[in-house]
Amino acid sequence: MQRPILPKGLPDDIEVKKATARAWFESLRDQICRSFEALEDELTGPLSDRAPGRFTPKDWQREEGLGGGGRMSMMNGRVFEKVGVHTSTVHGEFSPEFRKQMPGAEEDPRFWASGISLIAHSCNPHVPAVHMNTRMVVTTSQWFGGGADLTPVLDRRRTQDDADTVAFHAALEAACAAHPDVADYPHYKAWCEEYFFLPHRQEPRGIGGIFFDWLHAGEKFDLWAANFAFVQDVGRQFAAVYPDLVRRNFNTPWTEEDREEQLVRRGRYVEFNLLYDRGTIFGLKTGGNVESILSSLPPLVRWP
């Protein structure tokens, strides 16, 4: 999708709005971490003889001269082979190379950004991998972005009529339907399918979800609350539906062939994140925490 030209200008209470958004992202992080740890406790099927995993939080600060930092929360468990739930709030100036790509940054390179990012890779091949992020960005303009997408790793589960796919799409459609003045589900669904695509393989990364960016209030600053409420509901719907999908599948036995297929599919995940993902590029270009940025990569991968 082509980047729009966003109206410039910030409301008088922009600092309050920044603090409100940051507090939400951090609250959602804590809620999801508690939920995922509960899943670790609930497992009774394969690998249940292992100890349940727990998140290890790690705070970080940007390098000297750069502003802000964040918290990495990583877990390697018996349900989640690797999951990261991260928040960050950073500020500074975009590099000359990067400022042309960001609305409102060409004349004034200063920026502020806060958000949450999550990627989960499960032990059981029947449990789909998942990604979710939402963020607020401020330059001389302001906007929200984010989305969520599901990646089943077994080909027989990578269909639009699979029960997991149907439930995931329904949850995100509900988030959009609750906010018709600011959210466009058909557009965001199509945007996700266009974005999470590997051109060199001519195949999608997963079964889709939603993707949105540059969601802004323009000169109608009262719309900020409506935009923020939608962003919150994306997080709430994700936090409700994905644990349900895990519960449906995490006790299902799997074969060595299933595990092999999972590892090969993860290779596609690596290819997308390193070649095309805007979030990865944004983090590396703005002096983000490299360990946190690359934590999205799965722990074990295979290229046949």
UniProtKB/Swiss-Prot annotation:
The keyword Metal-binding applies. It is found in: Cytoplasm. Residues 56-65 have a biased composition (Basic and acidic residues). Residues 269-304 are annotated as: Important for dimerization. Pfam families: Coprogen_oxidas. It comes from the Bacteria. GO terms for molecular function: coproporphyrinogen oxidase activity; metal ion binding; protein homodimerization activity. A divalent metal cation binds at residues 121, 131, 169, 200. SUPFAM superfamilies: Coproporphyrinogen III oxidase. Its EC number is 1.3.3.3. The record marks 200 as: Important for dimerization. Pathway: Porphyrin-containing compound metabolism; protoporphyrin-IX biosynthesis; protoporphyrinogen-IX from coproporphyrinogen-III (O2 route): step 1/1. GO terms for cellular component: cytoplasm. One of its GO terms (biological process) is protoporphyrinogen IX biosynthetic process. Its cofactor is a divalent metal cation. Residues 44-73 are annotated as: Disordered. Keywords: Cytoplasm, Heme biosynthesis, Metal-binding, Oxidoreductase, Porphyrin biosynthesis. Substrate binds at residues 117, 133-135, 287-289. HAMAP family: Coprogen_oxidas (MF_00333). Involved in the heme biosynthesis. Catalyzes the aerobic oxidative decarboxylation of propionate groups of rings A and B of coproporphyrinogen-III to yield the vinyl groups in protoporphyrinogen-IX. Homodimer. This is Oxygen-dependent coproporphyrinogen-III oxidase. It comes from Allorhizobium ampelinum (strain ATCC BAA-846 / DSM 112012 / S4). The lineage of its organism: Bacteria, Pseudomonadati, Pseudomonadota, Alphaproteobacteria, Hyphomicrobiales. The gene is hemF.
